[in-house]
Amino acid sequence: MSSGTLYDKVWDLHRVAELPGGSTQLFVGLHLIHEVTSPQAFSALKDKGLLVRCPERTVATVDHIVPTTSQQRPFADPLAEEMLSTLERNCQEYGIPLNNIGSGRQGIVHVIAPELGLTQPGMTVACGDSHTSTHGAFGAIAFGIGTSQVRDVLASQSLAMNKLKVRRIQVNGLLPEGVSAKDLILHVIRHLGVKGGVGYAYEFAGSAIEALSMEERMTLCNMAIEGGARCGYVNPDQVTFEYLKGRPHAPEGDAWTRAVAWWSSLATDANATVDDEVVFDAAAIPPTVTWGITPGQGLGIDETVPSLDQLDPGERPIAEEAYRYMDLQPGTAIAGVPVDVCFIGSCTNGRLSDLRAAADVARGRQVAEGIKAFVVPGSEQVAKAAEAEGLDAVFRAAGFEWREPGCSMCLAMNPDRLEGRQISASSSNRNFKGRQGSASGRTLLMSPAMVAAAAVNGRVTDVRTLISPSAS
């Protein structure tokens, strides 16, 4: 294999043909589907009399539309029930495995594929969901695709793609106590912009990245798309291999030994050239919260909402829109902003380590009066593991609701929604206007631990004041 970046190597291994116009037909090693973007794709297959090309490389789950308070069938929402029923019929007809409610394997698509060992280094992964970049944490190249492309992958197990440039995001040092991978990626997006990664794959590297757990790396790669990058990835290493070993779909025995050797060879070579490199100092990254209506409008917890003259000219129109929508004026300290709803979950931060971090803050404390706070595990496996550790009891004792797995309040496709002008402290990935279900609802993105801190204080809070020795 020639030297190069992991992106180059994986691209070359999956290249089928060069297409007219300069794009490449790329083989897809793993296709993940769910109930929202697959129905029209299956209908198109039926209209053309086509079969699913590789059902054994296709895996389904239900996540976006499922209620989290009760998942008894039929769902109260007839549209949600029809969407799941349609997915069930399509999977049965085409021989696609479905990780359904009650199977012990259901959950958010970007949570279950890694925990089942489906996502592996060197793969190309596609899914009709923006945050498919999550799987890059394993040294895979993972793309979110639209419904028409879901159809194409079902029919041909390939995609027409244009090759990206590679930007290395080098993060040196170690993150301070109380600062998480969520803070890191919000910090990166703040400084590079929501369009800064357009045309790029982001390679996350450096000692701070190497020190992250796999679940933290998934958080990082999950939000690469929010910085404009089509995908983000971390080179596979011992952390990757230890996470995968023993999972249901991971290789075993001699096959495992061979796989690890091959996976190791895929990492970016020391002499590889990247198209761009940006360096960050991990020690300088604070707990970070968004104040506006894009993930790039972030602030360190000790900062204030910027004035127009502090911003680049290109950032000013969206800032003015954010001032009006969020009702936050220049000079307002982000710490102390009151919240109404606190949501812990999503494909960004709904994994076991996320719940542990939030529970550490909630333990022995109480949700502030008038605050609605709830925790939604990212999968049935996460819920089971958290309950085995007693995390559900910690949250309930503190006044949080403990819910069933699903996408929940990350987006407005299920009953979990903001009302009116409510402000949410959310561990999800997007703070767009109306994203959480109310046309005027407001979202502040932050880490799960920061959400828990906001819940117990009723306002945006520096979590470091609650986890330091003097606070205990």
Curated annotation (Swiss-Prot):
GO terms for biological process: L-leucine biosynthetic process. GO terms for molecular function: 3-isopropylmalate dehydratase activity; 4 iron, 4 sulfur cluster binding; metal ion binding. Binds 1 [4Fe-4S] cluster per subunit. Keywords: 4Fe-4S, Amino-acid biosynthesis, Branched-chain amino acid biosynthesis, Iron, Iron-sulfur, Leucine biosynthesis, Lyase, Metal-binding. Its EC number is 4.2.1.33. Signal peptide: none annotated. It catalyses: (2R,3S)-3-isopropylmalate = (2S)-2-isopropylmalate. Its cofactor is [4Fe-4S] cluster. [4Fe-4S] cluster binds at residues 347, 407, 410. It is an enzyme of class 4 (lyase). Pathway: Amino-acid biosynthesis; L-leucine biosynthesis; L-leucine from 3-methyl-2-oxobutanoate: step 2/4. Heterodimer of LeuC and LeuD. Belongs to the aconitase/IPM isomerase family. LeuC type 1 subfamily. This is 3-isopropylmalate dehydratase large subunit. It comes from Synechococcus sp. (strain CC9605). The lineage of its organism: Bacteria, Bacillati, Cyanobacteriota, Cyanophyceae, Synechococcales.
